[in-house]
Amino acid sequence: YNEFHMDILPCVPKTYYLEPYLTDIRLTHKINASNYDDRYSNPYGYRKWFETRMDKILAKEKRTFAKENKLEIEDVPTYRVKTPLQMAIQLLKRHRDIYFQNNNENAPISIIITTLAAKAYSGEETVYEAICSILNGMEQFIEIRNGVYCVQNPVMEEENFADKWQVFPERKTAFYKWINKAKKDFISDPLNAIGLDTLADEFKKSLGDAPVNRAFNKCADDMYEARKNGKLYSVGLTGGLMTKSMQGATQVKGHTFFGE
């Protein structure tokens, strides 16, 4: 777990009325080394909102998991499955970490990436389609109010996740440069790559060797097992191969050396 960290921030309810439907909280906001300000947020409400952005795909993934593990759908907790939206966000954060490894102070914070990605997501069923849709659409959800750039908290209008951009405009500039680089690395360059080896090399430049090697090795193993078990599908002429059936997909027949 040395690659992960957890931020812990003390907070209290926003009001003294402890009602179960009131989930707003009051927290401290660091202005500088010795000054703090009151701010408000609603992480529980945010989580519920995030789940609504992928509710149909989340339900589908839970049904698949339940069937494969012989469980009732109600018994499948959300954390046991991952949607294309969640995986796309993971990839964007990894790309962010590599891109800003020598400029960490200007890296976009995770809540900005997560919020814009969730707003731009349109229910795509594959990770690649999701990340293309997100990268091509997330900028339109950045508002400019009286000259101030705003990434609004969807469950608390007064909270601007990009408030530091006003104080540190170089962070805003860095964000837009990163978006353009991510579009190149995830969309333009892969489309021009010839062969899996070339594709893997392209991804290693922006995501690192280890995760790309793991992903491509697992992909090869999954494709082999899926074809052997009759669960490999082809989508159209250019849609590629996948291990889950979807609309328009054709089952790939098993391969033998004797033509049967």
Describe each model-derived feature in a short phrase.
Residues 1-41:
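Conserved catalytic core of two-metal-ion nucleotidyltransferases
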Residues 35-86, 204:
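Long, charge-rich alpha-helical interaction segments
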Residues 26, 39, 47, 53, ...:
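Arginine residue identity/basic-tract feature
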Residues 15, 23, 28, 52, ...:
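Residue-identity detector for threonine
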Residues 143-260:
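Terminal (often C-terminal) interaction modules
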Residues 68-191, 195:
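Conserved nucleotidyltransferase catalytic core and NTase-mimicking acidic/glycine-rich helix/loop elements
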Residues 1-3, 23, 38, 42, ...:
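Intrinsically disordered, low-complexity regions enriched in small/polar residues
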Residues 4-21, 122-135, 170-181, 214-226, ...:
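Short, Lys/Arg-enriched charge-dense amphipathic segments
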